[in-house]
């Protein structure tokens, strides 16, 4: 399945559900309390993040999609913190504020990146479902997907009215379900329970075959358009009526914190579907997104650049021939992993042993090697009529096959200054016997603090000499 980055900027999504504030107290622990056998945490940082339905909306906005949110809060400091955070992220939030009830707050005490304790401040909201529905109805005509983010806290009491209103307008409804009565989601386009939530409804599943069978029965009973069961380290399974089940393996490189992973799944699904992606592609994107977010601490959102880089890795563009946009993303990803970027350039018309040795030496100057190749027109200008012998596509394909080379890109100019300005490598390498001040682009690299290194050429290795020898024998 080939993946690409959707046009999220044209994919408005409305999220309705249980809004909460995730609050973190960060501090150090160096002693045990004399009052009880518990650690003493000296709090040095307090952090607020949108949680629940607010985190879903935040994730959608972080992908670049227009996001609106309808929910219920108290009339308190926590509600103000939520409102300010969402506004800063570009989320249009419309809250029904209840004066005599607190905003739901999940307080986590953290030390050394570990959660020591969670304290919940909450009461089930006694809301007017008609007022909330009216707010939703007023926004339906401007959206492409409706998300019901249900945590069972009382904001959602009229699921069927919302689902039917959206269906009448042809708007897909995605629901992240809660509780032991999935009948309230009847008619939804897609529901996304995790395995525990799913088995609480259908019973324990011995294997994937039983999961598929029970899932198909549930879809038929509830008239669901599709069912996505998220299964932790086992990935996720997409079920659709009369179609083969789609099992996707987990994509997490490292699991650090699963908080909010379900929010990331449904938000990526919603944004992708709103952008026109087919459901299997949207699920694959959500699977990639979940693999990224579980590597972060606490309730976290995935950004568009992070998802784009994950798509590149999935499509095999982590190495090889890239365009400028792909290369810049790959470089950003490498830098995020503290890797040193090395850059060299040339015509590389007929690749020979001298080239291979030089490129291996260049790669040894850092962690990642970019080889910029003159295109055919620029080679002809530099080398004269009859050159290049090999087209730029063939030259790049051969270079990309070398173990020392990570990324190959072509450029039309005679020299690579434009590329250097965009890429900003840590090290610029050139082969020859001249001084650093004679290396083209050295001034650009040195201006931002990069290094320039000159490597010696391998004797008796020259493309021009090889070409002349071939022509002489012809």
Curated annotation (Swiss-Prot):
Where do the catalytic residues lie? 263
Q: What is its EC number?
A: 2.7.1.167, 2.7.7.70
* Annotated region described as Ribokinase, given as residue ranges: 1-318
- The enzyme's first-digit EC class, named in words, is transferase
**Gene name tied to this protein:** hldE
| Protein name as it appears in the record | Bifunctional protein HldE
Quaternary state and partners of this protein? Homodimer.
Family of the protein in this entry = In the N-terminal section; belongs to the carbohydrate kinase PfkB family. In the C-terminal section; belongs to the cytidylyltransferase family.
- Residues noted as binding ATP in the record, renumbered to the chain: 194-197
InterPro entries on file = Bifunc_HldE, Carboh/pur_kinase_PfkB_CS, Cyt_trans-like, PfkB_dom, RfaE_dom_I, RfaE_dom_II, Ribokinase-like, Rossmann-like_a/b/a_fold
Give the span(s) annotated as Cytidylyltransferase: 343-474
GO MF terms held by the record: ATP binding; heptose 7-phosphate kinase activity; heptose-1-phosphate adenylyltransferase activity; phosphotransferase activity, alcohol group as acceptor
Check the record and name the Pfam families matching this protein: CTP_transf_like, PfkB
Name the keywords, alphabetized: ATP-binding, Carbohydrate metabolism, Kinase, Multifunctional enzyme, Nucleotide-binding, Nucleotidyltransferase, Transferase
Q: What does this protein do?
A: Catalyzes the ADP transfer from ATP to D-glycero-beta-D-manno-heptose 1-phosphate, yielding ADP-D-glycero-beta-D-manno-heptose.
Could you tell me the Gene Ontology terms of the biological process aspect for this record? ADP-L-glycero-beta-D-manno-heptose biosynthetic process
Pathway where this protein functions: Nucleotide-sugar biosynthesis; ADP-L-glycero-beta-D-manno-heptose biosynthesis; ADP-L-glycero-beta-D-manno-heptose from D-glycero-beta-D-manno-heptose 7-phosphate: step 1/4; Nucleotide-sugar biosynthesis; ADP-L-glycero-beta-D-manno-heptose biosynthesis; ADP-L-glycero-beta-D-manno-heptose from D-glycero-beta-D-manno-heptose 7-phosphate: step 3/4
One GO cellular component from the entry?
cytosol
Lineage at the top is: Bacteria, Pseudomonadati, Pseudomonadota, Gammaproteobacteria, Pseudomonadales
| Covalent S-S links between cysteines | none
Per its UniProt record, what Gene3D superfamilies does this chain match? 3.40.1190.20, HUPs (3.40.50.620)
Catalyses:
D-glycero-beta-D-manno-heptose 7-phosphate + ATP = D-glycero-beta-D-manno-heptose 1,7-bisphosphate + ADP + H(+); D-glycero-beta-D-manno-heptose 1-phosphate + ATP + H(+) = ADP-D-glycero-beta-D-manno-heptose + diphosphate
